[in-house]
Each structure stands twice: as C-alpha cells, then as structure tokens.
C-alpha cells in the first residue's frame, strides 16, 4: 500500500509441504446437479520451471471416502453442473485438507482421469446429448499418470513409499502418459522423435530447477 495501491488485498496462509502434499479432485455433475464422477489424485510432482511452476507432472489416483463425500455434498448443495476441478493441499499442522480453489473446467492434467478409466467425453455425451441417467462412478483403484519420464518421478519424489507404489503400478500396466498414445506414435517418426527430445528436456529442467 505504500506504493499507492488502494484496492482490496487477499492474504493467503502458506501451507507447508512439498509437491506430494497436493491433491487434485475432478468431478462431473449432471444436468440435474447430481455428481456422477469423482476422481481424486495424489500429486507426486509438479513442474518447477519459472513459467510452468505448479502444473501437475505426476499423479497417483487414490480413494478417500471422507474427503470425496464432503465435496460431493458441497457440489450438490449448490446445484452445480458440469466439470469441476479442485486444488487441495494436505496441512500437516492440523492434519486437514485445505482447498485453494475450484476451477469450472477439467484440469490441465486431466488425463489422469481419462487414463484411469473415466472418459470425460462419454459423460458429457450421455448426459447432455442422450439424456441418459448416469450411475455414480468414484475412482477407487490406484493408477499412475505422468507427463514426465519415470526416472524423473523416481528421482525427485521424496517419499519412497510413493515411489515404490509408482514402480508397482507401472509394472502392472496401471500407468499412462499424456504423450504415449500409440496411434499418434505408430509409424510417426517425427512425433516419436519429438517425444524423445521432450523427455530429455524434462530431465534437464528438473535437474536444473527442482532442488
């Protein structure tokens, strides 16, 4: 204010903890305001470049009935329709979850939802075009999504239990990457080369910025 700013200012409490304290919840509410899909992600790593900081880079889906019930009740109480995406952080000071915001859309890292078996396009078409009555789908099984090489996840995630879970899911084929669509890569040398260079660049970026 000493520099002449006169408008209101919001001061937000800083929640301690590294990337793995973050959670992301994506939901779909039908045209009647009823939640029909919920997928909670445990963020493992975020991007750390100056321009990309905060974007999710690796996620494991998880099930937390208490947390998901609270969000379901909230969305239905305001008769919300469409996609919703919540940024959440676990606060070790009082062992509670703190909600930063609700995005009125699917998130940038939304392929963690699709990859785990929840096709968001299908929900929209069946609800809005075909007017079907949808069943509630809550993602319960763990699934590993990433947009960076596995080696980066294994190196920079500090919680070894989470790293071991990633390795187990990868070995079981319960894993997806946003750049791993086989129909894009099959016979497409240029695209495959681009993904290879992208992966090398991600390794370089994390080594430089993620300390």
Which residue ranges define each predicted feature?
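Peripheral (often C-terminal) accessory segments that flank ATP-dependent C-N-forming ligase machineries
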Residues: 126-211
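Glycine-biased flexible loop/turn sites that connect beta-strands or occur in inter-domain linkers
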Residues: 33, 94-95
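A short beta-strand motif that forms the metal-chelation/ATP-contact edge
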Residues: 95-105
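A short glycine-rich, hydrophobically flanked beta-strand micro-motif that places a catalytic Asp/Glu
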Residues: 12-13, 81-93
């Amino acid at each position: 204010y000493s520099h002449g700013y006169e408008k209101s200012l919001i001061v937000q409490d800083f929640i301690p903890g590294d990337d793995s304290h973050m959670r992301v919840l994506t939901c779909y509410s039908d045209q009647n305001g009823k939640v029909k899909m919920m997928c909670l992600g445990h963020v493992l790593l975020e991007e750390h470049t100056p321009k990309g900081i905060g974007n999710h880079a690796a996620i494991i889906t998880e099930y937390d009935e208490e947390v998901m019930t609270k969000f379901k009740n909230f969305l239905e109480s305001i008769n919300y329709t469409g996609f919703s995406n919540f940024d959440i952080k676990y606060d070790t000071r009082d062992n509670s979850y703190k909600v930063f915001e609700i995005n009125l859309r699917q998130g940038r890292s939304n392929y963690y939802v699709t990859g785990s078996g929840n096709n968001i396009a299908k929900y929209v078409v069946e609800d809005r075009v075909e007017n079907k009555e949808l069943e509630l789908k809550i993602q319960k099984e763990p699934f590993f999504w990433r947009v960076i090489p596995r080696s980066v996840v294994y190196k920079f995630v500090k919680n070894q239990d989470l790293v071991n879970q990633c390795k187990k899911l990868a070995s079981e084929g319960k894993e997806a990457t946003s750049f791993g669509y086989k129909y894009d890569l099959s016979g497409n040398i240029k695209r495959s080369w681009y993904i290879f260079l992208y992966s090398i660049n991600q390794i370089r970026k994390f080594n430089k910025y993620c300390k």
